């Protein structure tokens, strides 16, 4: 088992549902975890598919919660958005954008291919300083509450297995292959350097 704990980041588009569900479960299991979004804005479902609620990443979960409570308490209670924001504000004050974080991680898990591409592109555009490797793995998770929960448990199980490897660099590919077979999902994987 590695001497230092695995530093994990979970990234989705708006740092609301998928990454926060995984953040919640991983932190309860004792992982050193942070979560992020890669979007230019935070988007939450609105009264119609073409009318999302759009916020700046500086907006707190509490402010979003109160805004939606004021707009339509019944709608946002019924569709689970208020419940989700309530959970989020217990974890951290506001969503964070991956591109603004300069912390180093051992493992970055993304929740969809577009986000994976954005994370890899961002890491590759940074100036390499330490040459420390970071594994970026994509686990496709649909953006709804049920799939976010299932995906979070899968991510947690994957992190626990990686945490217990003797040699992450040499064992991760085999581990991901086992997870693909077990879960029926395909994982994208690449290594970037800090």
From Swiss-Prot:
Transmembrane segments: none annotated. GO terms for cellular component: cytosol; mRNA cleavage and polyadenylation specificity factor complex; nucleoplasm. Keywords: Coiled coil, Cytoplasm, Hydrolase, mRNA processing, Nucleus, Protein phosphatase. It catalyses: O-phospho-L-seryl-[protein] + H2O = L-seryl-[protein] + phosphate; O-phospho-L-threonyl-[protein] + H2O = L-threonyl-[protein] + phosphate. One of its GO terms (molecular function) is RNA polymerase II CTD heptapeptide repeat phosphatase activity. Pfam families: Ssu72 (PF04722). Residues 160-187 form a coiled coil. It is found in: Nucleus; Cytoplasm. Interacts with GTF2B (via C-terminus); this interaction is inhibited by SYMPK. Interacts with RB1. Interacts with CD226. Interacts with SYMPK. Belongs to the SSU72 phosphatase family. Protein phosphatase that catalyzes the dephosphorylation of the C-terminal domain of RNA polymerase II. Plays a role in RNA processing and termination. Plays a role in pre-mRNA polyadenylation via its interaction with SYMPK. This is RNA polymerase II subunit A C-terminal domain phosphatase SSU72. The gene is Ssu72.
């Amino acid at each position: 088992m590695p001497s230092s704990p695995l530093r994990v980041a979970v990234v989705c588009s708006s740092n609301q549902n998928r990454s926060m569900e995984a953040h919640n479960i991983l932190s309860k299991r004792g992982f050193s975890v942070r979560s992020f979004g890669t979007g230019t804005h935070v988007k939450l479902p609105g009264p119609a598919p073409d009318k999302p609620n759009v916020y700046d990443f500086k907006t707190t979960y509490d402010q979003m919660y109160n805004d939606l409570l004021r707009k339509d308490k019944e709608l946002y209670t019924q569709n689970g958005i208020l419940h989700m924001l309530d959970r989020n504000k217990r974890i951290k004050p506001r969503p964070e954008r991956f591109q603004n974080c300069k912390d180093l991680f051992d493992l970055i898990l993304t929740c969809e291919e577009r986000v994976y591409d954005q994370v890899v592109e961002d890491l590759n555009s940074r100036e390499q300083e330490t040459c420390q490797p970071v594994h970026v793995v994509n686990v496709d998770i649909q953006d709804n509450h049920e799939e976010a929960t299932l995906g979070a448990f899968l991510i947690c199980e994957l992190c626990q297995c990686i945490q217990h490897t003797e040699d992450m660099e040499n064992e991760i590919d085999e581990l991901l292959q086992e997870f693909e077979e077990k879960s029926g999902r395909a994982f994208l994987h690449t290594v970037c350097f800090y």
